[in-house]
């Protein structure tokens, strides 16, 4: 099956691990040649990214934000097992060679930093983590450094597991527990806002428990989409995860209030086990968010306290001017009296929903990373060349006229609907031009939606024997690789949801249906998310669902 069955783990190791894993346990690795770093061959980075060809020295990513490692990461840290992986890199358990302290090292492959946007995201993540004061609720950054092949963020180790997993594992889940979690999340938001930072991607997966103790602190771990802001400043870039996205994000006019909305979505899920705004498609999710109708009728809401429901309503207030601030949320009676909140179990239905939500996310995350991993350098390079050809005056942007002219030149490669989408992008962004990052994002969206090739590749990754079905053992092995634990219980829960014809295995059609139901495309690709939701926003603007106003 060739490259389509290449594990994301293998790809990540090729990009990152080979440049810094110790040759043998506990031993230092000899200094590597400067030009022999990871990704030296192929994978050019467009628009100022961290890429470079064979024999080329890669440009520094961190600059003043980090230190440069001449010999590689293992001069200072011994890296061990993989803890997780994302779009750009892999997180490893590591040990400080001097102090023997166990830490986590997030290694970001420079080869995957394809554009200036990617590089700036990493640089800003480090700057924000350094800017925020130390807090028991935020993972601490010990060091940021880079070598030839990767950027390494060495952080405090959190071994207590994800938020929902801990809740599901407990035999007794109550409003009181939900209130304690909510307080921690909103305290993180308050700290960020006080120090001029919007998180922009609050979701359960971005919170881990520090350890496995019952009283372990909950910590925010990911600031990859966070941004600095000044009072009154508004942003238009669409980022974040669909379920947790505030309506003003879709309207392209937002400020720090979006973090309260996202925290409100998490609270709603904590209390009932499902998102408040859900649909079969991304457009359906977006329209549900814009309608803002909150369901308090289904189980277990009749048994939830009025104070809890009042706080949910106020956090999910569609008008950001009327939405509670972090300070007001923390002063709300439900949180002020958290110790008096009902300690009666919310019921098995909530735990069951949370477990399903968590495990389906894990399966989708795995599949989406396979999709992201197989966006080839050639695909990106083709887009880059098209951009250069259209940018006839070489000013780094494609104007409306250049786009129209370029589309005529490249017309055979673009369907009419795709041409229209690109033109709409220019018409609605207010600049009458596309920079490379915008052009790339929209183009990636067009490529991915043009056919099911990427979904087929992801399916074949799981279908190891090529018989046309993902069988229980194949699914179990893939999820074990992804750190889900060697548990058939997880597999059976996923099968129960995805295997609609109940034949004990997952067909391609069942897999596609799962992937297209409320899928969180942010986990597939940051570029894809930006392109997809910018395109979706344009569509909603065009059909009148979204009104662009100066708020």
Curated annotation (Swiss-Prot):
Q: Which parts of the sequence bind ATP?
A: 83-91, 106
SUPFAM superfamilies given in the database record: EF-hand, Protein kinase-like (PK-like)
The UniProt entry, under Gene3D superfamilies, shows: EF-hand, Phosphorylase Kinase, domain 1, Transferase(Phosphotransferase) domain 1
EC category: transferase
Q: Which domain of life is it from?
A: Eukaryota
The UniProt annotation places Ca(2+) 2 binding at 427, 429, 438
Q: Which residues bind Ca(2+) 4?
A: 499, 501, 503, 505, 510
How might one describe the regulation of this protein's activity? Activated by calcium. Autophosphorylation may play an important role in the regulation of the kinase activity.
Write out the function statement from the record: May play a role in signal transduction pathways that involve calcium as a second messenger.
Q: Which protein, by its recorded name, is this?
A: Calcium-dependent protein kinase 3
Which gene is transcribed and translated to give this protein? CPK3
